[in-house]
Regions:
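N-terminal beta-strand motif that seeds the catalytic metal site of vicinal oxygen chelate
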Residues: 1-21, 71-73, 119-122
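Vicinal oxygen chelate
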Residues: 1-3, 33, 84-122
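Generic recognition of long tandem-repeat/solenoid scaffolds
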Residues: 15, 42-45, 102-106
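Mid-chain, well-packed structural core segment of small domains
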Residues: 66-84
């Protein structure tokens, strides 16, 4: 059996640290856990998924446009409308996509996510 693990990392420009922190803690309600490095913040999702965000120089990060061509992730929630409202109020950039049944957006730093119901299938 093969599975995908519960850890992911990406690089974000160092100037976005406060915005990223607010996004993952205030909007997505993650918990920040201790990090082994000063340029790394670790965010724990309720399902025990750990996201590592490295704060880097411009030469080490993808542009928002490049993120549109990179891997997209999915965030599942019990209350899609409530989370979508928090995302919009925070100011995420909506991503236009053919699938209009879901809300696609870019987090601070450019990572693309799709918002889906927890029990909503594919």
């Amino acid at each position: 059996m093969t599975t995908i693990g519960n850890h992911m990392k990406f690089n974000v420009h160092r100037s976005l640290r406060e915005q990223v922190r607010s996004f993952y803690i205030d909007v997505l309600q993650c918990t920040m856990i201790p990090s082994p490095a000063p340029n790394l913040e670790l965010y724990l999702f309720p399902d025990k998924f750990v996201l590592g965000v490295f704060f880097c120089d411009e030469s080490e990060v993808l542009s928002e446009e490049d993120h549109l061509k990179a891997a997209w992730l999915e965030i599942k929630t019990k209350d899609v409308q409530a989370l979508k409202q928090r995302l919009v109020e925070f100011g995420v950039k909506e991503v236009e996509y053919a699938d209009k049944s879901r809300f696609y957006f870019q987090a601070p730093g450019g990572q693309v996510f799709r918002l889906a119901p927890e029990d909503g299938g594919i």
